[in-house]
């Protein structure tokens, strides 16, 4: 008669738990340690003692997030009141610009999603305080209006034509000017209601 060790049901991996946490016994009886392993389609990471990791896990210069079940997460994760984006497929924490659907987001070097004004070294952008999504077109911040490039989202300055009207966005701040404006030796009047010339 075949031994129990050779029967198919005896050759399946198994999750085990003790007072320190969860670990996984491979079908051959070994335990994964200090590595990532795909189990039933989900990625898990194990520490040097073989225990399953949860929360933020570094691997080289890259961070990954594992939920309470230990499975690696991708997409948006809220942790400690901040939002993070984990790349679909790899699960790596994103930094810098990230496109999700039709919207762009900016992640700090710590991975936290930014909101409000951000300068990425090339231009100023405004990220919606509620969603973090890059704003394009007109946006009111405080009592001032700004115009963000409808294609790139970069803050525009100087003269801008929107529809049939011209607007002036102050260099330096980008705020829309109203009332009388002197530019290049000429005076212009910009509506105090709409800013249109």
Briefly describe each language-model feature range.
Residues 1-197:
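Extracellular adhesion/carbohydrate-binding repeat motifs centered on closely spaced tryptophans
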